[in-house]
């Protein structure tokens, strides 16, 4: 049975994904970050305490994992939280990628955001080949998602099989 790890499992995308993976006969492991299990209460999931911003907490979680679905993110548009946004979205993604690569994970699926892409000029279609946000004065969340995507691409070049 394929073991899938979901980061951000208590969020909307993660909680929805849990149900779909269980329906497809995956064994599902979740990072228990905040003890909030309401999103998947009563479901057959393996919970292991951890925090993507603390790399040392991830090694045990990644043992025997076949595929990682990285949905975790700190979604906030308030510039006052720029350091926290960057720590979770960029540094956390780097930790997930690094541990996945070194643990022999076969595949990682990274959940990015439309906000990672430069939306200007506004009247053009926003396609996935659009340039990533690179303006240091951009909304911190947008820049963090763009930089997280760059991290994933960097690890793809190091040998981690990824989809974004």
Regions found by a protein language model. Give the residues of each.
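NAD(P)H-binding glycine-rich loop region in Rossmannoid oxidoreductase-like domains
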Residues: 45, 49-91, 99, 119
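SDR active-site strand-loop-helix element
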Residues: 7, 31, 68-72, 108-114
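N-terminal Rossmann NAD(P)H-binding glycine-rich loop of SDR-like oxidoreductase domains
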Residues: 4-24
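Conserved Rossmann-fold NAD(P)-dependent oxidoreductase catalytic core, especially the SDR/UDP-sugar
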Residues: 95-141, 163
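Conserved cofactor-binding/catalytic machinery of classical short-chain dehydrogenase/reductase
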Residues: 54, 91-95, 107, 147-148
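Active-site Tyr-X1-5-Lys
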Residues: 137-163
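Residues forming the Rossmann-fold NAD(P)(H) cofactor-binding site
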Residues: 14-16, 90, 146
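Conserved glycine-rich Rossmann-like NAD(P)H-binding loop of the short-chain dehydrogenase/reductase
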Residues: 26-35
């Amino acid at each position: 049975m394929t073991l899938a790890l979901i980061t951000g499992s208590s969020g909307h995308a993660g909680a929805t994904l849990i149900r779909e993976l269980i329906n497809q006969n995956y064994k599902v492991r979740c990072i228990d970050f905040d003890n909030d299990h309401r999103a998947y209460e009563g479901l057959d999931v393996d919970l292991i305490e951890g925090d993507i911003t603390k790399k040392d907490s991830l090694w045990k979680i990644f043992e025997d994992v076949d595929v990682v679905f990285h949905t975790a993110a700190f979604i906030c548009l308030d510039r006052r939280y720029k350091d926290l946004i960057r720590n979770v979205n960029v540094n956390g993604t780097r930790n997930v990628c690094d541990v996945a690569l070194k643990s022999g994970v076969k595949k990682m699926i990274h959940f990015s955001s439309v906000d990672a892409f430069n939306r200007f000029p506004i009247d053009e279609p926003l396609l996935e080949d659009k340039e990533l946000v690179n303006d240091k004065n951009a909304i911190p969340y947008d820049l963090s998602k763009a930089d997280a995507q760059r991290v994933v691409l960097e690890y793809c070049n190091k040998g981690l099989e990824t989809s974004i």
